[in-house]
Amino acid sequence: MIPTFRIQIRRYLNTEVKRRLYAQCLNRDFDSLLAEVKGIPVSEMEESFVTLYLMKSAQFGHVPSLDYLWHKYVMRHHMIMVNPSLLCDIGNIALQEGKLFIPEQLSSHFMKFYGSNNEYEQYRYELLRIQVESFAKGTMEKTSFREKWKVFLQDLDHTVERDFQFSVRDFPHLTQALSGTDRELLLKMLFSEGKISVCNNSSLPMLLNMILLQEEFELEFKIKLFQNFYTIHRHLNYEDTVTILFKNCKGNGYRSIELMEFVRGNKITTPHLAYKYFLQSIIDSEYYFKAYDYMDLVKKYDGLLEQLRQQE
């Protein structure tokens, strides 16, 4: 009886069944497909189909399929080697959907098969970023921002090149976790050497930017904080910083002009978006006439010149 049973199992994936499975996958009938795949023995499943199914599940965000395929066919049975790009896609979906144990597994899978190849460095960074964000999101109030920042330093700051450019836009959950943190503690983290050293040139500016994005801090404090930080670290990249600050100055022409004088006086590189926020803030305030000092910039942005004329 046992040999007969095995013969029946091996005949499960006949041509008709394979055709149906591929059709369901390509037609995005994932719910029906998942139900059928769960009944197929691992020994009968083909690597090429699992790879296609995993790829399509990630492409169209079918979380139940991703969760099942990843844990059964990748983690438990090690059937397929997932390419770096797909690992990142799965990681972003896992982060979004709260599957917060998966990102660390993705990084381990990547390091096992691709870790020694510098060609895939961008994927390594992306997977580590997702891992850091996953920790920041998953632990919520249970873990302090200081601990979450330590994880960032250990997992990312210490592992990428010194001149790799971090951006606050890539870490929304870590930024959110900073809210409510004691002001004095943040100043200590920003200006004092901690137990874990900071290696990357953009890590501290990113921490500064995270602080500047917090609504709980007043604008005057933010501008002074930037000025004090800049006097210590003059040769770092502040493009994100000045953009955030000028956006914060919306409707406050006085502070906006004060900030611009500091930026120009120190010849700090300023991106076009920051200039646009600056001009908009003074045109919308009682200091609109100061915009005439920057007419070369006003003319570059659609609508600003007309707004200025309407203020006259």
UniProtKB/Swiss-Prot annotation:
Topology relative to the membrane: Peripheral membrane protein
Transit peptide start and end: 1-12
Subcellular location: Mitochondrion inner membrane
GO terms, biological process: positive regulation of mitochondrial translation
Signal sequence residues: none
Thylakoid recorded as keyword: no
Main subcellular localisation: mitochondrion
Segments passing through the bilayer: none
Keyword field: Activator, Membrane, Mitochondrion, Mitochondrion inner membrane, Transit peptide, Translation regulation
Xref: InterPro entries: Pet122 (IPR008732)
The organism's place on the tree of life at top rank: Eukaryota
A GO term for molecular function: translation initiation factor activity
Any matching Pfam family: PET122
GO cellular component, one term: mitochondrial inner membrane
UniProt KW Mitochondrion keyword: yes
Function: Required for expression of the mitochondrial gene for cytochrome c oxidase subunit 3 (COX3). PET122 seems to work by directly interacting with the small ribosomal subunit to promote translation initiation on the COX3 mRNA.
Name this polypeptide is given: Protein PET122, mitochondrial
Gene that encodes the chain: PET122
